[in-house]
Amino acid sequence: MTILNHTLGFPRVGLRRELKKAQESYWAGNSTREELLTVGRELRARHWDQQKQAGIDLLPVGDFAWYDHVLTTSLLLGNVPPRHQNKDGSVDIDTLFRIGRGRAPTGEPAAAAEMTKWFNTNYHYMVPEFVKGQQFKLTWTQLLEEVDEALALGHNVKPVLLGPVTYLWLGKVKGEQFDRLSLLNDILPVYQQVLAELAKRGIEWVQIDEPALVLELPQAWLDAYKPAYDALQGQVKLLLTTYFEGVTPNLDTITALPVQGLHVDLVHGKDDVVELHKRLPSDWLLSAGLINGRNVWRADLTEKYAQIKDIVGKRDLWVASSCSLLHSPIDLSVETRLDAEVKSWFAFALQKCHELALLRDALNSGDTAALAEWSAPIQARRHSTRVHNPAVEKRLAAITAQDSQRANVYEVRAEAQRARFKLPAWPTTTIGSFPQTTEIRTLRLDFKKGNLDANNYRTGIAEHIKQAIVEQERLGLDVLVHGEAERNDMVEYFGEHLDGFVFTQNGWVQSYGSRCVKPPIVIGDISRPAPITVEWAKYAQSLTDKPVKGMLTGPVTILCWSFPREDVSRETIAKQIALALRDEVADLEAAGIGIIQIDEPALREGLPLRRSDWDAYLQWGVEAFRINAAVAKDDTQIHTHMCYCEFNDIMDSIAALDADVITIETSRSDMELLESFEEFDYPNEIGPGVYDIHSPNVPSVEWIEALLKKAAKRIPAERLWVNPDCGLKTRGWPETRAALANMVQAAQNLRRG
């Protein structure tokens, strides 16, 4: 029984973000469709070859996506919302981009599809839309074309397909309500057709992803798996693939399915591999997800070997990444600025492939010498002085309940804030960032590369901040922001100014579409050596009589959007960040900043996948936010911002944050999210986002007014704010001015009644 290895997927964007650059060039009309398609082909060929060279036996094909793999699946099934369809019924790459972005080089602009987080990761997918009586047919053959490409290059191919039940689970019903699970029998013939086409190509194994099987699914959804897979069996071998959690709670459902193998995440799940082996059918292959696909730490391969060795030789076995390597940067070897000791603690996607090769070889041969050598640096890290800061640990241990309480309740604070700010009804503001122009990015890059001295850099940033203030005053906004010209990324910026983080040069991972992020890495205890945001906030406030918000990224979001340590709990990391940023709130307040926004867009996405684990997470997540904010005086208004959220199931926790104002992303869901706040009778102020900043389309005054009137039916108008869905960093100035002018006009119209 020779053990093989494989990955569940590989990063798509390219080491130098080649895909991002090609996408954005095409969208801007600066390159042709054929040039874009060529970049995709080159990247796929390179990535297959890199995995093969690193020692991977079975290469994933179908993990590449032009925007998002769930959206690719929608096109495969012919699930194109009517507003995005071509007049002749055809489907092309611009159809895909219109669904994702709201517009493309061809076709009519229309509202983009809703976007939300992929399980509990920092990746986003485009939510499939379902309508009653919907028809499905094989429409988009990207998977088959890519399989042909890989076969022509001589690769050992394992196609990757998002499974039918998970696909339906991830979607939403539009229009007349019905049970979307009722569409299962309608999509299965398309899956059968795809599997038949793969069988014709001589494919032996297909990786069929059903990550919904790690969730606490309703019984009807669990019951749907058996008939679905009865319909899909027989053409190729199916590797039922799960990740992000364990499968033990749903194992009875899984073992009844007519599949030939099961992949389990042995990093994030608590499944005992020996127990799994006992319960799985003896003729099934087990794919053991031993290498963490969503972090950057080098694996202790001696531990991984010990975890799996007891079942070696007892069944067919593959070793694999826990999930797709999509969530990891590509290659550690190009990081030239990392300290050698710290660098030795990491492994990116290609290094993880090498780890899988080492592990496979050791399991096949019984020789573990190479594993011990590989694991030595990560074992040595446990004793490094760069990891532990006694002062931070002491401060954390001394936290009391009082540290997470504002001095007075919201009603008392609101009165003090009204007296201080004297804002009009329907106050207007933005979420924080303004367009990051080429000039701004060049300025930061020149400074970072040493081509610009500190004085000239500061002068340049000050000019951009001044421009942002002038623009906002001209537009008539009520509460201003400084625009964040100095910030490359809302998490990276804070990480750069906090001890305990390190940064990469090329550690990019895809967030959605062409958007990539370069997460900081938490390597040790976190503290704040000096104020971070105070200087620029104070400068911006000196330029205007209107209030300027101080802008902080909250502790849970910094945690969720960084690569965390694996040797302490997430709670510990979050509270260390909260204590550091608590000092920042106090310093902003002392500098005369009266409104401070602590962004927590990631609060909900950090939820464990199983509801039974939610309470513990929400308890410490809320406490971290309150530790961060509670130092503020009554007349300092604390805002928070959240996006991509469904709130109804965590409203108690949202209210427990005790922010004076919460701004939320609601435009894509047509104010749906406000139902939760209405039903809960949310007591504080709310700014429901009135337009979608992810789309370049400019909303009309009438559209915004209609949304605000809809909001006012749910929330008393005196507690409503008017703002976009999110920061404006990715937009250009022309559409930003136009959209904000319409937003301000809508608010003014409502004030006049």
From Swiss-Prot:
It comes from the Bacteria. Binds 1 zinc ion per subunit. Pathway: Amino-acid biosynthesis; L-methionine biosynthesis via de novo pathway; L-methionine from L-homocysteine (MetE route): step 1/1. Pfam families: Meth_synt_1, Meth_synt_2. Its cofactor is Zn(2+). The keyword Metal-binding applies. Keywords: Amino-acid biosynthesis, Metal-binding, Methionine biosynthesis, Methyltransferase, Repeat, Transferase, Zinc. L-homocysteine binds at residues 431-433, 484, 599. It is an enzyme of class 2 (transferase). Gene3D superfamilies: 3.20.20.210. The keyword Lyase does not apply. It catalyses: 5-methyltetrahydropteroyltri-L-glutamate + L-homocysteine = tetrahydropteroyltri-L-glutamate + L-methionine. One of its GO terms (biological process) is methylation. Its EC number is 2.1.1.14. InterPro entries: Cbl-indep_Met_Synth_N, Cobalamin-indep_Met_synthase, Met_Synth_C/arc, UROD/MetE-like_sf. Zn(2+) binds at residues 641, 643, 665, 726. One of its GO terms (molecular function) is 5-methyltetrahydropteroyltriglutamate-homocysteine S-methyltransferase activity. The active site is at 694 (proton donor). HAMAP family: Meth_synth. Catalyzes the transfer of a methyl group from 5-methyltetrahydrofolate to homocysteine resulting in methionine formation. This is 5-methyltetrahydropteroyltriglutamate--homocysteine methyltransferase. It comes from Escherichia coli O8 (strain IAI1). The gene is metE.
